Amino acid sequence: MKTAPITPGRLAFSPDGVPLAPEFGDVYHPAAGALQQAHHVFLGGNRLPARWGGRGRFVILETGFGLGNNFLATWDAWQRDPQRCERLVFVSIEKHPLTREDLARAHAASPLPELARALVSAWPLSTPNLHPIAFEGGRVQLLLGFGDVALLLPQLVVSVDAFFLDGFAPARNPEMWEPRRLQRLGRLAAPGATAATWSAARVVRDGLSAAGFTVETTAGTGGKRDITVARFTPRHIAVPPPGGWHAHDAASREALVIGAGLAGCAAAWALSQQGWQCQLLDRAAEPADVTSGNPAGLFHGSFHRDDGPHARTLRAAALATERLAGAWIAQGRVSGQLAGCLRLESRWSDDAARAAMAAQQIAPGYIDWMDRAVASTLSGLALPSGAWFYPGGGWLAPRDYARELLARSGSLFRGGIDVATIERHSGLWRVLDEQRQVIAEAPVLVLANGLGANGLLASGRGEVPWPLTAVRGQISSLATDGHPATLPCPRLPVAGGGYVLPQTGGRLLFGATSQPDDIDPALRDADHRFNLQQLAGLSGCDVEAWSSLPWQGRVGWRAVTSDRLPLIGAVPDLEALDRTSRADQPRFVPRQRDARGGLYVFTGLGSRGITWAALGGQLLASWISGAPCPLEADLRDALDPARYALPRWRSDS
């Protein structure tokens, strides 16, 4: 999907205080009030809250978030309902999101002040992607999609129980209500889905009918004579693609996760947000004790001229990390700093960088360009070039982060467990030791043990469909005590041909080497000298002054894929792939089902484990639980482990 620049909405008010959208020449809601319309049209028209009573999860899709009044009214109704669903998921698309300041102005006199303040506080940057936001400890989940409905509707991976068709009038915003847009709703509708809109225009009713809905009009409100309500009654039930976009059909919501590093702990946390219970097994005695045990690491997004899959997925991942870990850093639960990150870039001139940003109209709160002088002042180092500045980036202690994820998940951790093989038995996945004694079993198994995932996968099913390379990395640190005047201690992380972090715990941490297929666990002087040279390149300082200082280091191995993107999702069924007639995209590749279903992988995070963890866990949880996917469909494909099976199908087809 090619993203389009986001133009923020403008907010004005009529003389009697009704909020207006000047670009559309229309009101955000009628003078009678937004909540009255929300209750009569959208909640009442979808027979809510009655329909969500007793449900494990209820999903609403809204076309046009606007001021967020429909979401607030729905959240309030959920809070007040003693029979409420276990989890409420509200997905909403908005082409012109307001700034946080305008959203706060719009809700200055909200009749739901606490909920409105929570929404304003959580309001994301106006970047062109999906933004998952959790309230009520994860029991109310808002998934905001900023962009054109024409681009985002085909990219949603979601099963919708109720549609709130909002937006400005068809006469003023015809693209929103085009029949082909409305017809796409049928692809997303769950059995028994309903829809409601304040518009009774013929084009709206015909579009819903063509999408498989039975349409009728009923009494309106707020000056509207009629409104439209509809029930999904398709003539034919669509068969999901063979790759399966749906949840694993498990009788109990229990999962085994092998590996208790960042990936495994994030998987457990995200699954707990969907009501799943996990048991984590790890060879180490404590969680996050191997590669995720580095004392500190940095995180930030990415920027490319074409805004392709790498840039888009890393942007979404960095924003998710900032939202989750940033709060824990502020609370003192995770050691770290959320004060931005600089990434040096000598290939860009100042003019070219600013022109690329202007072309994408990227939100300044996500990225900015700083020339050499400004970047040097910000960092406190004499930098050799200009740099991209990521305001939401920073550094944290990955062990703290992983253990906080694990603690919040409520999962059982079992350390000192050496899993030798895996097998499927009587509808459950079993993990076994060297003596083939059963260690644990569950209907769902997640391989989140880095490089060890391939060996276990081979033990349980034979062929491994993807390459995974072990890349050795050695980091270095120097004591800052007694050397503050000579060591280049930045005020914030600086990266680009290596990295250096602000001093913490009396030490300066920098690195790192990148050595594929090097299995030497010993610290090496040559690698420390290499890290010093990288530090010199970042800081403009002479390394000779530090080469004789005592140093410490740590060695770990990153699991890296050939395309530098993680492997997150259901393991493909290669035998079924050989028999399928269509597998031109990862989503169509068959998965393990029935006797061999319930096998998932979360590995290949490379050197960006901190950045990938939160979003990767949420993506994995959506695969397993059937919750709305936090990424667009093409980005889900880009991280799908089945992408490596496509050449096999093409060669056989």
Swiss-Prot record:
Region annotated FAD-dependent cmnm(5)s(2)U34 oxidoreductase, chain positions: 258-653
UniProt catalytic activity: 5-aminomethyl-2-thiouridine(34) in tRNA + S-adenosyl-L-methionine = 5-methylaminomethyl-2-thiouridine(34) in tRNA + S-adenosyl-L-homocysteine + H(+)
Gene3D superfamilies to which the protein is assigned, alphabetical: D-Amino Acid Oxidase, subunit A, domain 2 (3.30.9.10), FAD/NAD(P)-binding domain (3.50.50.60), Vaccinia Virus protein VP39 (3.40.50.150)
Any one Gene Ontology cellular component term annotated for this protein: cytoplasm
One of the Pfam families matching this protein, by short name: DAO
Region (tRNA (mnm(5)s(2)U34)-methyltransferase): 1-233
Compartmental location: Cytoplasm
Cofactor: FAD
Known EC number: 2.1.1.61, 1.5.-.-
Keywords, comma-separated and alphabetical: Cytoplasm, FAD, Flavoprotein, Methyltransferase, Multifunctional enzyme, Oxidoreductase, S-adenosyl-L-methionine, Transferase, tRNA processing
GO molecular function list: flavin adenine dinucleotide binding; oxidoreductase activity, acting on the CH-NH group of donors; tRNA (5-methylaminomethyl-2-thiouridylate)(34)-methyltransferase activity
Gene Ontology BP annotations: methylation; tRNA wobble base modification
Biological function: Catalyzes the last two steps in the biosynthesis of 5-methylaminomethyl-2-thiouridine (mnm(5)s(2)U) at the wobble position (U34) in tRNA. Catalyzes the FAD-dependent demodification of cmnm(5)s(2)U34 to nm(5)s(2)U34, followed by the transfer of a methyl group from S-adenosyl-L-methionine to nm(5)s(2)U34, to form mnm(5)s(2)U34.
Family annotation (PANTHER family): SARCOSINE DEHYDROGENASE-RELATED, TRNA 5-METHYLAMINOMETHYL-2-THIOURIDINE BIOSYNTHESIS BIFUNCTIONAL PROTEIN MNMC
Entry similarity comment: In the N-terminal section; belongs to the methyltransferase superfamily. tRNA (mnm(5)s(2)U34)-methyltransferase family.
Name of the protein this chain belongs to: tRNA 5-methylaminomethyl-2-thiouridine biosynthesis bifunctional protein MnmC
Species per Swiss-Prot/TrEMBL record: Methylibium petroleiphilum (strain ATCC BAA-1232 / LMG 22953 / PM1)
Gene that this sequence comes from: mnmC
